[in-house]
Amino acid sequence: VKPTYSPPRAFGLGQNTGVSVKRDSLSLSFAVGVYGAAFGAASVAAHFSVLQTCAISLLTFSGASQFAAVGVVGAGGGAFSAIATGALLGTRNGLYAVRMAPLLKVRGAKRIVAAQITIDESTGVALAQNNEKDSRTGFWWTGFGVFIFWNIFTLIGAVSAGLLKDPAAYGLDALVPAAFVGLVWPRLSGKRSYYLAAFAFVFALSLVPFVPAGIPIISTALLAILMGWRA
């Protein structure tokens, strides 16, 4: 049986109407956006410039993919491994788009904008509502909210880390795994997902001594996709 790709509705949001949808969307946007500071600092610690770091957030705008790609580069991996890792983790956003397209019913330039902000949070808030109007409101407010806060905090984190002579000496490179776990943990639901996450973690660690940087993450992502597809 093929799985249904709906993002978790575990963001602490229930079914709301009108103003409450916007309020919850902005609250969630700020909470998620703060992680952008961790990405900004981690990216600079991995020897990306402030400009490059901000460009990654503006153009990629996918937290897990960004942290994974920067982590690969920071560990000594090549550009191909970093891009492949980020792309694999970002495939879920494409699956969300399939779910959201009939609901949003957008075309032209608006469709391109919608694609950029189709993420876990915007899709999750949209699907948590009980009518199409509130769903669309939740999607747009959350999507734009996270985008704005994420990029603001990315800049703050990058500039702050850039003021340090050696960001890695302050342990900022540890922000990548810590923030990655922080992003993933709320999305786990049920014993099966926890078991799969634990197995993937052990599997990735077991590969580290034997393969180049980036390959463990790519292999783990492929394993997770395979397990999810067979569920």
Model region roles, listed by residue range:
Residues 1-21:
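Short, Lys/Arg-rich, polar N-terminal cytosolic tail immediately upstream
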Residues 5, 17-19, 32-35, 148, ...:
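Short acidic/polar alpha-helix capping motifs at helix-coil junctions
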Residues 134-219, 226, 230:
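Membrane-embedded alpha-helical modules
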